[in-house]
């Protein structure tokens, strides 16, 4: 169940800009994340990442976990518990926040996040309502991602109620849109063992592959934030957010 982190070389210049998740608080317990500028062989819950620089293509395999290759440890949490991720630094105030989970088919040691198994547990965009909204591009503070710039650089999400137990990856993703038509993706992954006796699992309509949940040409990915002649709208990419028991009940009612 445990794996040792491999070593990876980093350029010091990568620390000068952008950012990455470097710590977590899960179910009230603090967990250090991977520190790319510290000695190798770190026993942490987070998949190692190469640097603070973005993934620039929606089809790049690194989009899944920023090139991460596994972790030695995992956190334990129950449905309804809170996951808080903290970034060491963050400077971009326009774009969405997406938080995903993925149920591993077995042990973490063989879990690579492949296939259409990723589901969102949280998202925030312009004013954080997760729907198409009119966007005032001259007011970057209208984006919830701006809270990472002016606040403590942390974002909290809840594990879906009634989520079935098992080994999961949790993936935090920031998509910076401050450069028109040139999106920047910042994903990191960590390992969580969900406990309890829940039975809620997302249906196929809530799941997606990463990469694959979006295309580079999508209007909400290659987004011209500076073009005021266009209808100023933004819809967060990907499937709807899975809320666990509530989502399962809603689906059963619709059926």
Curated annotation (Swiss-Prot):
Applied biotechnology uses: Lignocellulose is the most abundant polymeric composite on Earth and is a recalcitrant but promising renewable substrate for industrial biotechnology applications. Together with cellobiose dehydrogenases (CDHs) an enzymatic system capable of oxidative cellulose cleavage is formed, which increases the efficiency of cellulases and put LPMOs at focus of biofuel research.
An annotated Gene Ontology molecular function: metal ion binding
InterPro entries named among the record's database cross-references: AA9, AA9_LPMO
Keywords, in A-Z order: Carbohydrate metabolism, Cellulose degradation, Copper, Disulfide bond, Glycoprotein, Metal-binding, Monooxygenase, Oxidoreductase, Polysaccharide degradation, Secreted, Signal
EC annotation from Swiss-Prot or TrEMBL: 1.14.99.56
Glycosylation: residue positions: 152, 220
Protein localization: Secreted
Binding-site list for Cu(2+): 18, 92, 186
GO terms for biological process, alphabetical: cellulose catabolic process
Cofactor: Cu(2+)
Effect ascribed to mutating residue 91 to A: Decreases cellulase activity and O(2) consumption
Keyword Disulfide bond: yes
Class in the EC hierarchy, top level: oxidoreductase
Residues at which O2 binds: 178, 184
Reaction it catalyzes: [(1->4)-beta-D-glucosyl]n+m + reduced acceptor + O2 = 4-dehydro-beta-D-glucosyl-[(1->4)-beta-D-glucosyl]n-1 + [(1->4)-beta-D-glucosyl]m + acceptor + H2O
Note on cofactor: Binds 1 copper ion per subunit.
Record-annotated disulphide pairs: 65-189, 104-111
Family: Belongs to the polysaccharide monooxygenase AA9 family.
Function text: Lytic polysaccharide monooxygenase (LPMO) that depolymerizes crystalline and amorphous polysaccharides via the oxidation of scissile alpha- or beta-(1-4)-glycosidic bonds, yielding specifically C1 oxidation product. Catalysis by LPMOs requires the reduction of the active-site copper from Cu(II) to Cu(I) by a reducing agent and H(2)O(2) or O(2) as a cosubstrate. Is active on regenerated amorphous cellulose (RAC) in the presence of ascorbic acid or 3-methylcatechol. Also acts on phosphoric acid swollen cellulose (PASC) as a substrate.
Protein's recorded name: AA9 family lytic polysaccharide monooxygenase D
Organism: Thermothelomyces thermophilus (strain ATCC 42464 / BCRC 31852 / DSM 1799)
């Amino acid at each position: 169940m445990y794996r040792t982190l491999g070593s990876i070389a980093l350029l010091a210049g990568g620390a000068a800009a952008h950012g990455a998740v470097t710590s977590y608080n899960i179910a009230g317990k603090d967990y250090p994340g991977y520190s790319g500028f510290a000695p190798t062989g770190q026993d942490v819950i987070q998949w190692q990442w190469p640097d603070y620089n973005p993934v620039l293509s929606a089809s790049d395999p690194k989009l899944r976990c920023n090139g991460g290759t596994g972790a030695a440890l995992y956190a334990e949490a129950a449905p309804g518990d809170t996951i808080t991720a903290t970034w060491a630094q963050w400077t971009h105030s326009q774009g969405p926040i997406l938080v995903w989970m993925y149920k591993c088919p077995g042990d973490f040691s063989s879990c690579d996040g492949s296939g259409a198994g990723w589901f969102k547990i949280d998202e925030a965009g312009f004013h954080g309502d997760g729907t198409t909204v009119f966007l005032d591009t001259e007011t970057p503070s209208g984006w919830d991602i701006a809270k990472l710039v002016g606040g403590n650089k942390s974002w909290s999400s809840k594990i879906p109620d009634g989520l079935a137990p098992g080994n999961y990856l949790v993936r935090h993703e920031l998509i910076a849109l401050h450069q028109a038509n040139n999106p920047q993706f910042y994903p990191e992954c960590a390992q969580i063992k969900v406990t309890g006796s829940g039975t809620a699992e997302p249906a196929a309509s809530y799941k997606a592959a990463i990469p694959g949940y979006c295309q580079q040409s999508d209007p909400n990915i290659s987004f011209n934030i500076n073009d005021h002649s266009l209808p100023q709208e933004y819809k967060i990419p990907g499937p709807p957010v899975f809320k666990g028991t509530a989502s399962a009940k809603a689906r059963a009612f619709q059926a």
